[in-house]
Amino acid sequence: LGQQMVFLPGLAEQKAIARQLDFVEPQLDNAKEQLDQLESLIKSRFVEMFGDLSQYESRDLCDCVSSLETGKSLKCQAFRRMGSAPAVLKLSAISSGIYREAENKALPDDVKPVSTKMVCEGDILLARKNTPELVGRSALVGHTDGNIMFPDIVFRMHPCEGIYGVYLAYLLANPLFESVRALAHGSAKSMSNIPKSELARLGVPIAPLELQCAFAGFVSQVDKSRFIAQQQIDKLQTLYDSLAQEYFA
């Protein structure tokens, strides 16, 4: 290691590089902070509207969704798709709690996608298998450009009539998250797996429909700001990564 040659630009160039990176980093931090504040706003509103969840009737998750299924993993390229070409989601598409369809891997031309495993608007996707820190993470698909599959390490569910997807998705990602993660089997150092049969029996508090509707309307308004903030984060992160690649690769 001591004999390794390291490229070291001149002092003026080092300062120029530092200025560019220092310009991007605060903007990235601010956008992430804005996203956190919006998430806190939703959490506060949820508690304000629903209060103690134990006051509501509880149903098994399998009685709250019309289906609970795993996806399909196919041989993929190392890069994301172009346009609406067929692709498979990466786990990073849902691990933040916000559905990010750009996190995908393109399918090769000679691999045929499976139509029954395509993501649809209104789906709730939940990480069935992942590291202990990320297993159980979930996100609601508010919009999809189509032609994109979910992998076999993800559960897909769709709420039954009478249950708002926004409400159920929020429950799974927040108040019930620790209960979901507690279902996972596996050691602290290995990939953890949530059995379908155990997830199906998870107790879900069902609030009155009018409250669910009001909460869904509130989240819809906040989501407009969350979408803008997430777009800004993605753009700034791409810029930062490209600068780092240019200067340090």
What is the meaning of each model-derived region?
Residues 3-18, 26-72, 201, 206-214, ...:
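Non-catalytic DNA-recognition/assembly elements of restriction-modification systems
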Residues 1, 90, 115-173, 195:
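A short beta-sheet element
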Residues 57, 74-81, 183-185:
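Short coil/turn segments at secondary-structure boundaries
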Residues 62-78, 92-124:
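Sequence-specific dsDNA recognition surfaces
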Residues 20, 164-171, 211-214, 218:
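Short amphipathic alpha-helical coupling segments at ligand-binding clamshell hinges
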